[in-house]
Amino acid sequence: MDDLTLLDLLECPVCFEKLDVTAKVLPCQHTFCKPCLQRIFKAHKELRCPECRTLVFCSIEALPANLLLVRLLDGVRSGQSSWKGGSFRRPRILTLQDNRKAKSSPRSLQASPFRLVPSVRIHMDGVPRAKALCNYRGKNPGDLKFNKGDVILLRRQLDENWYQGEINGVSGIFPASSVEVIKQLPQPPPLCRALYNFDLRDKDKSENQDCLTFLKDDVITVISRVDENWAEGKLGDKVGIFPILFVEPNVSARHLLENKGHQLSRTRHLSLMSSPSRGKATNTSSLRKSPGSRRKGSGQFSMTTALNTLNRTVHSPEGHQMVEISTPMLISSNSPSVLTQHGDKADFPTSSTGQVSSSQPAPASPGHSTAMVSVPSSQQHLSNNMFVALHTYSAHRPEELDLQKGEGIRVLGKYQDGWLKGLSLLTGRTGIFPSDYVIPVFSSTARKTSSFPDSRSPTVCTTWALSTSSVSSQGSFAEGDPRQSGPFKSVFVPTAVVNPSRSTPGPGSSGQGSLRKVRSSMRKNGSLQRPVQSGIPTFMVGSLRCSPTMVIRPQRFQFYPPQGMTPSPTPIMVEMGSKSIYTGEPALTCINRGSKTRIHSAGNSIIMEGKETPIKSEPPPKPPASAPPSILVKPENSKNGTEKQVKTVRFQNYSPPPTKHSASSPTSGKHDHPATLKGSQHEAVSSGGEMTILFAHRSGCHSGQQTDLRRKSAFGKTMPLLSTASATQTLFPSK
């Protein structure tokens, strides 16, 4: 641009004449020529700006001159063009190039009469700048060209590798690796742009009042990160939390969220390594903070009920613990030591790897899932809609829900045939998923049956039923028991019902039918909670029921297991007859009550293990030809165990003469108590024949050890010698 073109642009907006140094600047910063201002004042007797109609209170002579115009005209007349490379040079800035020209040109040393403002070097201390490390010429039109050692003014940072800067009035971009930053650019505020609308106030105003409501394309100022999925932000004068996936953060906000996320993950990892239980308690307490504990002002924002509402698994009443997914940990159901350690919390079935941990006994999961769910006993009603994913499922439609193996699901209802609608406890998302991909955590009606049709096997029909084993809460534990913290509640214990293959039909069949009725009523009622007193006669049914792995706590004359016989830690032998009962220290009473049999023991904790699968080993000693038929139950031993456990059930062929005994009314609810214990024993002898029971502790017997059990009964017969190589042998009279 030449000087003539520049002078043509400098004209008065009123008369369109060329401006000169006599032009005046009004208080509104508009510039007009002096003759135009005089004509306006003469015509209207006052001076107002022709552009904005601003009133001028001083005279025309008192108005200042336009300093920029004076400098431009001075530069044009002196032959120095003020336009360099198409960029207008700022006033009051003296570059290094101007300094060189001033020293080399003697003409510039003479003061100009029109130069009113001195050129002063700009203060560079607070200006973001960088020093060039090498020559850069650039290949694209927008690249900035500079030489080594040049000082470049930084305008903004495009990304981690590129800057936009200015040198000698020329702006462009250049790589960050070619310069050394002397003064960093001020960091932009951490902002994020909303990608979707977010509003939860209509759902639950009381619990979602701490959520930050925004619309799409709103700009939110990020304050801090709350957890992996939530951040705290400010929009206008409102402060709240919002989901991170709903916004797009800028560079500063991304760095802030990433640094906070790393700190949260590191803190959580250290807390879990140091104290898992304390970390879980701290996490739960932080999730359940009341809204009143939130800090006031724009400082740190504590996570309150809004985050708790979206991340919690179920709605629990006040004062109750929340259901939470604990760290997975598999406990072998065949290890009695582990079961003894966790005996205070729950009973573990052998076919399940689920863990139930609570302060009071709670039902364990009957399924084969590896999901670990901690449910307090006060919230057993939540088991109806709690499910665990058996397999991983990828969603094929937007309304479907992704499932991870072992993930907890809260089922909200049935969507259609084969599909359920539920809430993921891991992600908090709601959707539909196939029903065959999940399994309920608890189910009071779930039963898994498996039958062995081979008649030669030790068990003709083995049925796994989810039976209900309960202990009367009216009694008390033994004194000094450290585990006595509260009354027992009904727990689920899988039991194996072994029916003998050669039991002859007779009175026993009706007894088994009544047993099935009682068992069905037990399942309906949920538990057997009636007190049992010592000395009440009982009756043994022709079936052996035992739990493969079961932990039983003692209770003084109140233990009432429906599984039948349970061994005691010390050898016990009971002989039914007119003689006195000979037992070990833990008293065991076998008495008669009409047509039902129970064995009540007040011994210490009992662990009984056994599996119904037979193992191939040397056959047991065969009884003589004259001996009555018997069934040998030989459970499979554990892999690491060296002891063998043999159970023999022998049924006598002869039937003793029936005797009269008092029968109680089934509907009266009262039991007939015998006058003396001897009378009860005498009735048991007359009705049940002779019966010898041997309980051998697993660690108390060795292979080859024999116990002489030859004792005379009331009938004057001698029992044969029984070998007890870690065995439990029971002889029952046939029905």
From Swiss-Prot:
Catalysis performed (reactions): S-ubiquitinyl-[E2 ubiquitin-conjugating enzyme]-L-cysteine + [acceptor protein]-L-lysine = [E2 ubiquitin-conjugating enzyme]-L-cysteine + N(6)-ubiquitinyl-[acceptor protein]-L-lysine
Single GO MF annotation: protein phosphatase 1 binding
UniProt region (Interaction with PAK4), positions on chain: 372-465
Gene Ontology biological process: negative regulation of apoptotic process; negative regulation of JNK cascade; negative regulation of protein ubiquitination; positive regulation of cell migration; positive regulation of JNK cascade; positive regulation of proteasomal ubiquitin-dependent protein catabolic process; protein autoubiquitination
PTM annotation (Phosphoserine): residues: 655
Lineage of the species this protein comes from: Eukaryota, Metazoa, Chordata, Craniata, Vertebrata
Species for this entry: Mus musculus (Mouse)
Family: Belongs to the SH3RF family.
Domain notes from UniProt: The RING finger domain is required for ubiquitin ligase activity and autoubiquitination.
Biased composition annotated in UniProt, kind: Pro residues: 617-627
Family matches, as PROSITE patterns: SH3 (PS50002), ZF_RING_1 (PS00518), ZF_RING_2 (PS50089)
Gene encoding the protein: Sh3rf2
Low complexity: bias regions: 357-366
Region (Interaction with PPP1CA), start-end ranges: 647-652
Name used for this protein in its record: E3 ubiquitin-protein ligase SH3RF2
Ranges of compositional bias, category Polar residues: 272-288, 367-378, 523-534
CDD domains listed in its UniProt record: RING-HC_SH3RF2, SH3_SH3RF2_1, SH3_SH3RF2_2, SH3_SH3RF2_3
Residues covered by region (Disordered): 262-302, 333-378, 497-534, 612-720
Summary of subunit composition and partner proteins: Interacts with FASLG and PPP1CA. Interacts with PAK4 and TNFRSF1A. Interacts with DLK1, MAP3K10, MAPK8IP1/JIP1, MAPK8IP2/JIP2 and MAPK8IP3/JIP3. Interacts with RAC1 (both active GTP- or inactive GDP-bound forms).
UniProt EC number: 2.3.2.27
Pathway assignment: Protein modification; protein ubiquitination
Source superkingdom: Eukaryota
